[in-house]
Amino acid sequence: MNINELKNKILQLAIQGKLVPQDENDIPASVLLEEIRKEKEQLIKEKKIKKEKTLPEITEEEKPFKIPKGWEWVRLGEIGFYKKGPFGSTITKSMFVPKSDNTIKVYEQKNAIQKNWTLGDYYVTKEYFEAKLKGFEVFEGDIIVSCAGTIGETYIMPPGIERGVINQALMKMNIFTGINIDYFLMYFESILKSTAKESSKGSAIKNIPPFDIFKKMLFAVPPIVEQLRIVQKVDEIMAYLDELEKTILNDNII
């Protein structure tokens, strides 16, 4: 087993609840999910989000592995908001203009893949943004995801980003309070990305599955305190493995 295979194994153990011990004093994930449900209902009531189609109940046959006591299975659509970029005809090169005080940045796949918001120099006018693209604006804390070709690469938009929108090759995600972002992304990397690749359409160019499939994907939710313990332990082990890999490379060079 090489270092990369070992890292993947660590992630598999982590998301199955086999990497850190469970604590019976932790507030169970069912309580957390009830709070998320209430938060979602309030946002719908305030008309900040639209009520979506009810997702199907999770069957035993769907569950890919057994989870510990206190954990819960949910579907992606139950724990966050997801929005794909505009149709291709909404943003084309003919609409791009030089950067100025009257422009809005258009974020691209490379921003997610290379995890750098400063890349790229495509802009549209504020007038066009207000008329056609306002719903695709990204904010600090949003997760952007590459959706075509190199799919599933994620990037959390940091403080100080330039005001902008996602293009047609990106999706943005907002996860509810109570789901640790680092845990979510770790799960996304280990399970959801590979699932998305397997179920994506096309052979030459892979794409994130349609939303009706994507939102039905399963997500294992530990108690919030355990999420933090898992992330901490994974970070600790990954840092050690990175150092080990460097040592092996240096020994091979010598």
Segments the model singles out, each with a brief description of its role:
Residues 88-91, 112-124, 143-166, 181-186, ...:
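Short, ligand-facing micro-motifs at secondary-structure edges
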Residues 58, 72-115, 133:
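Low-complexity, Lys/Gly-biased intrinsically disordered segments
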Residues 9, 13, 18, 61-89, ...:
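Non-catalytic DNA-recognition/assembly elements of restriction-modification systems
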Residues 147, 163-171, 202-221:
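A short glycine-rich beta-alpha junction/loop motif
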Residues 2, 6-62:
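Extended, domain-scale alpha-helical bundle/helix-rich regions
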Residues 127-132:
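Short alpha-helix capping/helix-loop boundary micro-motifs
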Residues 71, 154, 216-217, 227:
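Structural signal for hydrophobic
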Residues 137-139:
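Short, well-ordered loop/turn sites that connect or cap secondary structure elements
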